[in-house]
């Protein structure tokens, strides 16, 4: 009884996360500004991490947790890089005294 109830909730959560991911990907493509696209990319990566975590529960393995960490790192670095590009027009500052 508990197993079927758990399977039902995990399956329904995966379906809802899939729908949410499709909606965020639509917004990522259609977003009016670059800032909207950055926020949407961050939300899509969080949804993707949740889906991978649920799949890790379904398959009963810990091997997917490395991919969750990789998605989080890529999401963080890309969000910071794009935000710096929007703010100043460049990601790396060539006039920084620490680079000399």
UniProtKB/Swiss-Prot annotation:
GO terms for molecular function: sodium:proton antiporter activity. The chain crosses the membrane at residues 6-26, 38-60, 64-86. It is a multi-pass membrane protein. One of its GO terms (cellular component) is plasma membrane. InterPro entries: MrpF/PhaF-like (IPR007208). PANTHER family: NA(+)/H(+) ANTIPORTER SUBUNIT F1, NA(+)_H(+) ANTIPORTER SUBUNIT F. This is Putative antiporter subunit mnhF2. The gene is mnhF2.
């Amino acid at each position: 009884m508990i197993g079927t109830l758990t399977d039902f909730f995990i399956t329904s959560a995966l379906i809802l996360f899939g729908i949410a991911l499709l909606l965020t990907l639509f917004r990522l493509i259609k977003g009016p500004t670059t800032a909207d696209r950055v926020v949407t990319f961050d939300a899509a990566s969080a949804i993707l991490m949740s889906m991978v975590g649920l799949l890790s529960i379904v398959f009963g393995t810990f091997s997917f947790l490395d991919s969750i960490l990789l998605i989080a790192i890529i999401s963080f670095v890309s969000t910071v890089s794009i935000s710096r590009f929007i703010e100043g027009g460049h990601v790396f500052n060539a006039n920084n005294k620490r680079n000399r």
